[in-house]
């Protein structure tokens, strides 16, 4: 099974809200990192590296919490340049929570603000 990510709540979010991120189907990963990213016009993710959460996976599953921001300073992942302020309301692809496993597996789930 491929990696899956769910976020609760995922819509109508307030700036600074805490969401619960659940990951499953991470077949080979034992730990993961969750963070918020905005999707740029070219399809790259510009992520909020200031607020990321490492968590452990057991049987390919795990849960963590992430604080979400309507706007933040985005960095192209995994080690790319700072792209400046990004806003989830105006980002071409909106925003999502991305979970990356320690073996390169990843999944994502869209979020939106109220």
UniProtKB/Swiss-Prot annotation:
Q: One short Pfam family name for this protein?
A: Neocarzinostat
Q: Which SUPFAM superfamilies match?
A: Actinoxanthin-like
* Paired cysteines (S-S): 37-47, 88-95
Q: What is known of its domains?
A: This protein consists of an immunoglobulin-like seven-stranded antiparallel beta-barrel domain linked to a subdomain composed of two beta-hairpin ribbons.
What does this chain do?
Binds non-covalently to an enediyne chromophore which is the cytotoxic and mutagenic component of the antibiotic. The chromophore cleaves duplex DNA site-specifically in a single-stranded manner. The apoprotein cleaves proteins selectively, in particular highly basic histones, with H1 proteins being cleaved the more readily.
Annotated NCBIfam families: chromo_anti
This chain belongs to the protein called Apokedarcidin
Organism listed in the record: Actinomycete sp. (strain L585-6 / ATCC 53650)
Lineage, please? Bacteria, Bacillati, Actinomycetota, Actinomycetes, Actinomycetales
């Amino acid at each position: 099974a491929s990696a899956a990510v769910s976020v609760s709540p995922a819509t109508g979010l307030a700036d600074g809200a805490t969401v619960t991120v659940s990951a499953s189907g991470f077949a080979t990963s034992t730990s993961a990192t969750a963070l918020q990213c905005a999707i740029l016009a070219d399809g790259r993710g510009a992520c909020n590296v200031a607020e990321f959460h490492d968590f452990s996976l057991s049987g390919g599953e795990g849960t963590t919490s992430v604080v979400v921001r309507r706007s933040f300073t985005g960095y192209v992942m995994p080690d790319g340049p700072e792209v400046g302020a990004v806003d989830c309301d105006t980002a071409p692809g909106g925003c999502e929570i991305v979970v990356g496993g320690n073996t390169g597996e990843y999944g994502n789930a869209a979020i939106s603000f109220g």
